[in-house]
Amino acid sequence: MWYSKNWKDYELLDTSDGERLERWGDLILIRPDPQIIWKGVAKHPAWKKADGIYRRSHSGGGAWVKNNLPESWKIQYGDLGFVLRPMGFKHTGLFPEQAANWDWFSGLIRESNRPIKVLNLFAYTGGATVAAAKAGASVVHVDASKGIVAQAKENAALSGLSDAPIRYIVDDCKKFVEREIRRGNHYDGIIMDPPSYGRGPGGEVWKLEESINELITLTAQLLSDEPLFFLVNSYTTGLSPLTMSYLLELKVKARYGGEIEAGELGLKVTQTGAFLPCGASSRWYLK
């Protein structure tokens, strides 16, 4: 399991009964998590001091119960800054487990000693974007949500990257990739974090299990002659990291050689010392 030991502003304090108890900066949140199927034995005292709780409704939605929870606040991960907001579907605008991936590809970028161009697809609020840019890469950040891309720009500013070579694109990621292929553009590093489920502009249903093969096949065509890495993330339970790594084996390693790693991402629980699984990643990289 991959996890980051470098968080100071985030902490998974405890887990129990389908919920996480988390510290985000100075604020304590309780959020639902379907992976937490156990009942806690030793309850952390902060369970009774939450600033915000996300409660699911019987209709399938949910809402934040705010005690002392502001509309927004800021945290740091090393020299990276992030603005957080209580959002729909229990989210805050950041997935802290992804810091393990940020550390990994940032090291590759720094050690390459050459200009690196990165494409970040389904880039959300730009955690990976600012990590890559801070490591010295130029980045093309693509997400279909205008509001989310605006928050990514805020995170870049908080990270001291307002003038960094980051290009923000509000677009459907697959259509953008297809256009980049026609334009003949190439990238040294590719990051993709596709959603498990979605609907296209015409109302068509999009499922990751049915689309990941085509998505990787298309995007692999954008790799440069000397690529550095290709990272695929998944929060889809039915799509194992080994399945994604097999696709990277066929579409990337077969052409370039290199190494492939596959594993789960996790967060260490302070109260128990155990790890909470938080999705999976498959990594290809060229040594």
Question: Which residues make up each language-model segment?
Answer:
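Non-catalytic substrate-recognition/targeting regions of SAM-dependent transferases
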Residues: 6-22, 29-96, 103
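Conserved alpha-helix/loop element of class I SAM-dependent methyltransferases that forms part
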Residues: 96-114
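Conserved class I S-adenosyl-L-methionine
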Residues: 114-124
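Conserved SAM-binding loop of SAM-dependent methyltransferases across substrates and taxa
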Residues: 125-137
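Conserved SAM-binding motif I beta-strand of class I
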Residues: 138-143
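S-adenosyl-L-methionine
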Residues: 145-191
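S-adenosylmethionine
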Residues: 173-253
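C-terminal catalytic and target-recognition region of SAM-dependent MTase-like enzymes
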Residues: 227-287
